[in-house]
């Protein structure tokens, strides 16, 4: 069973949104984990109003994404108002980031993650066939 790790930095609205996203994943068969090293999907939800929250999220995601070569199957994503306002910057600062979802698109997070995982699986199958 795939595992999801969500870390929320920022306001109460971010907490509520993270809970909703977690419910979506659980309904689709994921298990929640509080350990990043067990997760198949790592999502950070951060507020752009609180600069300290933003910096913590960026720093932590940067560290985790560097581990991607050791855990290439993991999907890394940023959500929230920071993701919405700094989408292009995030992809530049964190080149291993797979997903950036703003506040108006929370309902599509699972769909995006599922698409990323399917594309990776297809690519692996293509590599095995060549």
Per-segment meaning from a language model:
Residues 1-130:
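Proteins enriched for Cys/Gly/acidic motifs involved in redox and nucleic-acid/cofactor modification
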């Amino acid at each position: 069973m795939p595992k999801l790790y969500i870390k929320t930095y920022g306001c109460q609205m971010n907490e509520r949104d993270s809970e909703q996203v977690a419910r979506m994943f659980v309904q689709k068969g994921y298990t929640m984990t509080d350990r990043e090293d067990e997760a198949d999907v790592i999502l950070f939800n951060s507020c752009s109003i609180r600069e300290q929250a933003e910096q913590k999220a960026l720093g932590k995601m940067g560290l985790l994404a560097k581990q991607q070569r050791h855990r290439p199957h993991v999907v890394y994503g940023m959500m929230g108002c920071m993701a919405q306002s700094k989408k292009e910057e995030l992809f530049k600062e964190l080149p291993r980031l797979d997903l950036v979802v703003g506040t108006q698109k929370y309902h599509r997070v699972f769909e995006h993650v599922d698409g990323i995982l399917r594309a990776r699986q297809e690519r692996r199958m293509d590599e095995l066939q060549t």
